[in-house]
Every structure is written in structure tokens, then in C-alpha cells.
């Protein structure tokens, strides 16, 4: 166990020295495994990990869902989702903020990435809120928080990777994320209402739109609704696997963007390059995490931790609560995927030994990552917005994001205390 603790310390030290966490995990895992196991088997293990990761059929779901999200973003559907939501509730106080949450939920049902959702909705939702006189802390906070729905509402990249690493059914993970995802969207809208109640001037009412315009706005989003229903309905119904669903989704998004005239040769090239770049980054993290996981598993840390918790006689739910607290702390200083992959080799065996459902734990991890994404000082969504909105002080983004941590934390506690919120839908799957 001492070797593993030194390994974790080494990763944190290298991270503080500004080394990318993928390289830090890979280097520490490789050197640590070489010292405790020997260099020849370590070299063989590293080569096998790279080969297995690069050629794993199940992992092809990752680039395909990324490609689907990029095609949909290129087609401009985020604007239409926002306009459709605004058409119905924009005339209320805080209506544009509520519309932003709904648009983020809709875009998240296609995108699967929190950062991409936040970046896209910043371009779509911030200008009209700024024009109407919304307070910067509310407009930036609701976009940053709404962006986190991109990883909660399926399809979700982080759910896919969790499912692959822990060998948990991805379709059941997607089904488990539906109710908590919708609940989080509702809680964020409650957060908007609370902010408007405390500070009515922060979110002025917009113009009321008539029913003909509302019907026209709904007609504009039929394509995205159909795509989501086909992909997720097929996965939930067992018609095809998550990988096949991702392929169908990417193909459908391609033809949809093509039909809308959004795909020139230059645009297609940019979509493919961006998808390849994101995929390469994720695969680098996966390879490094697998090497580090091999090192941790070779030490006695997972078994020692399980034995220690058993001897202490702590309530199982308290143990999971302590793990979630660790994730909250790590989420303020680390990127979400790296944080999850770094801790899963230690936490997951303990959770399964305590008899908890891995699908439920996967949803909890995504929920706690949501909180980390908008928690100062290193919440990734906040810095994405800061990079796009140079005119808005970072302090205002921090202020707004911190307020929306509360609704997301409430959602986390509800799923922790009432597991059926996550497990009810998967119970109907074969």
C-alpha cells in the first residue's frame, strides 16, 4: 500500500509542476510498476495496454459520439434549441436563463461533453442575455452549470468510459442518467428562480412570442429530437449496442448537417480534425490511467483499503459519502475524466465489495463531477467561459457558478439517499 500512496503523491507533485495529468499518471504508473514488478513485464504491459486501447471495439463508441456532437453543433441546432425554449418561457423573469438550461439539456442529449456544451451555449445564449440586461454572474453561472448536463443526460462520454473501465453495461448507465439528468435540469431552473427572487433586476423578462412563432420554433428541432429518440431508444430497447447506436447517431448527424447545407469541405475537415483531436486526448488519458491502474492493482492498496473499511465497521453509505467528498475536493483542482480514472482503481473495488450497484455508483460519480466542473478554482466550465468572454471578470463567473453548485449538490444527495432515482429505468432493461 505504501508504494501506491507514493505513486498518488508523485502524480499530484507532477501535476503541481504543470505536467499534463495524462503524462503524470503514465510516467508514475510505468516507473512504479517497473520498480515493484520488474522492467521486462512492465514494458510488455505498457505495450499491451496501448494496443488493447487503440484496437478495442467497445472504445469506438467514444469518437463516434464525439463526432455526432460536432456534426450537430456545426448544423447550428444549438441556436434552434435555445430559440424553441425561449419562445415558450422567454417572456418570464429569468426566462432566458431558464431557456438556457433547457437548451443545454437538449444539446447534452446529443453532445455528451460538458465542456463542448458550455462552449457552444456561451456563443448561443450569452449575447441575448447580455442584450436584455442580465447580470453577468447569472448569465455566466447558468451557462456553466447548464453545460454540466452534457455529461449527465445521455449519451455521456464519461459514462461510456466508466462503463468500459469497470465493465458496467453502458446502456444501463445511459438509462440510469435520464431521471437524474432531468432532475438536475429542474433543480437548476429552481436555482434560477431563487436568484431572480433575491435579485429581480438580474434577469429581466423578454418579449412574449405568439403561438405561430412557437409552432415554427418547434418544427425547427424535429431533427434533433428524432436523432435522440432513435439512438437512445434503440440502445434502451436492446435493438442495438451502444457502439452501434453511436455509429447510427454519427451517420444521422452527418446527413442532417449535410441536408441543412452546413457541411462544406472545409467545415467537414474542421469537424473531423476536432473530433480526432478530442479522441486522441481522451485515449492518451485512458492509456495513462490503465498503466497507473496496473501499478495500483499490483500493490496491496485496493485489498488493504477494503479490509480496513470492513474492520472499522463503518456504515456502507457513509463510506460512499466519504468517497464523494474526496471527489468534490479533487474536482476543484483536477480535470474530471483524469480525476475519475485516477481514483476508480481504488474506489470501485471497495464499492462493489460493499454490495452497491456499479450503475448507481457511476451516476453518483457523474453527479459529483458536475459539481467539480463549476467549483472554483479549477472548474473547467468556468475557464472555458472565461476564454470565450474576455470582457466578463472571472470573479463574476466564479460568483454565478458557485451559486449553482447548490442545486447540483442537492441532486447528488437525492440520488445518494434514493438510489431508485437512478436504478428504476435500468430495471426495465434486459
Predicted regions and their residues:
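Alpha-helical transmembrane segments of multi-pass membrane transport proteins
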Residues: 1-430
Amino acid at each position: 500500500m505504501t508504494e501506491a500512496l507514493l505513486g498518488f503523491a508523485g502524480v499530484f507533485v507532477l501535476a503541481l509542476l504543470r505536467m499534463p495529468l495524462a503524462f503524470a499518471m503514465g510516467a508514475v504508473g510505468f516507473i512504479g510498476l517497473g520498480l515493484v514488478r520488474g522492467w521486462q513485464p512492465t514494458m510488455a504491459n505498457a505495450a499491451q495496454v496501448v494496443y488493447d486501447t487503440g484496437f478495442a471495439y467497445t472504445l469506438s463508441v467514444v469518437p463516434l459520439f464525439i463526432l455526432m456532437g460536432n456534426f450537430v453543433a456545426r448544423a447550428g441546432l444549438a441556436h434552434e434549441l435555445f430559440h424553441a425554449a425561449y419562445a415558450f418561457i422567454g417572456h418570464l423573469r429569468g426566462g432566458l436563463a431558464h431557456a438556457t438550461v433547457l437548451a443545454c439539456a437538449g444539446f447534452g442529449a446529443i453532445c455528451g461533453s460538458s465542456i463542448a456544451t458550455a462552449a457552444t451555449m456561451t456563443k448561443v445564449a450569452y449575447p441575448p442575455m447580455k442584450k436584455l440586461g442580465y447580470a453577468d454572474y447569472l448569465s455566466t453561472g447558468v451557462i456553466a452549470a447548464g453545460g454540466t448536463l452534457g455529461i449527465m443526460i445521455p449519451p455521456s462520454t464519461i459514462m461510456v468510459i466508466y462503463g468500459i473501465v469497470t465493465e458496467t453495461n453502458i446502456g444501463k448507465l445511459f438509462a440510469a442518467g435520464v431521471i437524474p439528468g432531468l432532475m438536475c435540469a429542474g433543480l437548476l431552473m429552481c436555482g434560477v428562480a431563487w436568484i431572480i427572487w433575491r435579485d429581480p433586476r438580474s434577469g429581466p423578462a423578454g418579449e412574449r412570442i405568439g403561438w405561430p412563432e412557437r409552432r415554427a420554433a418547434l418544427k425547427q428541432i424535429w431533427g434533433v429530437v428524432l436523432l435522440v429518440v432513435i439512438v437512445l431508444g434503440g440502445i434502451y430497447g436492446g435493438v442495438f449496442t451502444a457502439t452501434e447506436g453511436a455509429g447510427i447517431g454519427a451517420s444521422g448527424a452527418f446527413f442532417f448537417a449535410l441536408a441543412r447545407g452546413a457541411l462544406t469541405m472545409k467545415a467537414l475537415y474542421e469537424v473531423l480534425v476536432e473530433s480526432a483531436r478530442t479522441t486522441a486526448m481522451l485515449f492518451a488519458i485512458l492509456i495513462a490511467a490503465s498503466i497507473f491502474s496496473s501499478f495500483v492493482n499490483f500493490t496491496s492498496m485496493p485489498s488493504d483499503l477494503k479490509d480496513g473499511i470492513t474492520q472499522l465497521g463503518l456504515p456502507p453509505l457513509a463510506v460512499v459519502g466519504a468517497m464523494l467528498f474526496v471527489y468534490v475536493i479533487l474536482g476543484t483542482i483536477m480535470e474530471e475524466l483524469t480525476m475519475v480514472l485516477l481514483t476508480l482503481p481504488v474506489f470501485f473495488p471497495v464499492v462493489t465489495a460493499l454490495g452497491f450497484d456499479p450503475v448507481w455508483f457511476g451516476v453518483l460519480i457523474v453527479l459529483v463531477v458536475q459539481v467539480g466542473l463549476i467549483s472554483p478554482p479549477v472548474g473547467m466550465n468556468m475557464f472555458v467561459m472565461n476564454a470565450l468572454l474576455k470582457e466578463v471578470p472571472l470573479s463574476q463567473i466564479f460568483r454565478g457558478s458557485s451559486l449553482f453548485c447548490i442545486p447540483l449538490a442537492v441532486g447528488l444527495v437525492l440520488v445518494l439517499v434514493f438510489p431508485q432515482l437512478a436504478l428504476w429505468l435500468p430495471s426495465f432493461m434486459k
